[in-house]
Amino acid sequence: MRQAGLVIVVLEGFHAVKHALRFAPALVRRITVASVSSALALCDALAPDVRELLLALAVEGPVKHPTGVQGEADRPLEDRSVLRQRSAPLVLLDDPRHPGNAGAAIRVAAAAGASGGALLGTLDPWHPAVLRGAAGLHFALPVLSCSLMEVAGPVFALDADGEPFPSLPDDAVLVVGSERAGLSVDTLARADRVVALPMRAGVSSLNLATAVSAALYAWRLAGLRTPGADAGTARPG
């Protein structure tokens, strides 16, 4: 396990700061705001639950982000146990190439109640562009790099040539390839089942985050798991 505090990450924008305060407030080191009153107005409109936390840490200063809010936080302790045992699907991205798409997939995983988000390949899951794409929701679930050999549980690999998409078991590993390269040969060989999302004839692929979203919400809507402490319905942003 990595020690928190060895790596500091930048929280770009109000939503990233909001999610860090909501899910890991003890890790937030600093919040810089262009205007305290404007930042509090954002809290009142979008996240009243973090208002007092933001007020306690906010210091006025220059901010480049258009929301007028940015911050710094310690990277959380790395929880690798989710690779071996889980009560909700683990999203495993097979060598993603686009940091923003990987971040968007992590954002969906957090929203849908996945147990974690893991990346195969060379992309750092905590790269600033990945964190930006996830709107700071790295603090809501374990996010890490791993190898195929570390992963246990039934592996469901999404591929256009797979069998019709089934209901995912709660301990599933949902593997999604990159838009350009798809799934690697090693991943396909490791998969217990290769499955496909139903799509209109002539449509061959989906955006990475869209595919993750469709699969995870099919799992949720199937009633296989009753999520605890849901925050409610989605709000844009």
Segments predicted by a language model, with ranges:
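N-terminal positively charged helical leader segments and presequences
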Residues: 1-69, 227-237
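Short, charged/polar "capping" segments at the starts of alpha-helices
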Residues: 35-43, 125-127, 163-165
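Active-site/ligand-binding-proximal alpha/beta "capping" segment
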Residues: 157-207
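RNA substrate-binding interface of SAM-dependent RNA methyltransferases
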Residues: 49, 75-162, 221, 232-234
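Structured adenosyl-cofactor binding patch, chiefly the S-adenosyl-L-methionine
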Residues: 71, 108-112, 122-125, 129-138, ...
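Short, hydrophobic beta-strand segments that form beta-sheet elements in well-ordered domains
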Residues: 10-11, 29-34, 143-145, 154-160, ...
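Amphipathic alpha-helical repeat scaffolds
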Residues: 13, 97-105, 204-211
